[in-house]
Amino acid sequence: FLPFIARLAAKVFPSIICSVTKKC
């Protein structure tokens, strides 16, 4: 369960940061 969340966060957070800061 926890590795799944870590893997999901690793995918989601960069795209959130990308869309917020416009730095991809």
Swiss-Prot record:
Keywords: Amphibian defense peptide, Antibiotic, Antimicrobial, Disulfide bond, Secreted. Signal peptide: none annotated. The keyword Disulfide bond applies. Expressed by the skin glands. It is found in: Secreted. It comes from the Eukaryota. GO terms for biological process: defense response to bacterium. Disulfide bonds join C18-C24. InterPro entries: Antimicrobial_frog_1 (IPR012520). GO terms for cellular component: extracellular region. Antibacterial activity against Gram-positive bacterium S.aureus (MIC=55 uM). Shows no detectable hemolytic activity towards human erythrocytes. This is Ranatuerin-4.
